Amino acid sequence: QGRAPHPPIPPAP
């Protein structure tokens, strides 16, 4: 609502 949904972060190796 106040914060925009962040894009999915790929898992680091």
Curated annotation (Swiss-Prot):
Gene Ontology terms for molecular function: peptidase inhibitor activity; toxin activity
In the record, biological process GO terms are:
regulation of blood pressure
Q: Which family does it belong to?
A: Belongs to the bradykinin-potentiating peptide family.
| Tissue expr | Expressed by the venom gland.
Q: Which residues carry this modification: Pyrrolidone carboxylic acid?
A: 1
Q: Could you tell me the keywords of this UniProt record?
A: Hypotensive agent, Metalloenzyme inhibitor, Metalloprotease inhibitor, Protease inhibitor, Pyrrolidone carboxylic acid, Secreted, Toxin
This one is known as: Bradykinin-potentiating peptide 13d
Function comment: This peptide both inhibits the activity of the angiotensin-converting enzyme (ACE) and enhances the action of bradykinin by inhibiting the peptidases that inactivate it. It acts as an indirect hypotensive agent.
Q: Would you name any one GO CC term?
A: extracellular region
Q: Where in the cell is it found?
A: Secreted
- Give the chief site where it resides: secreted
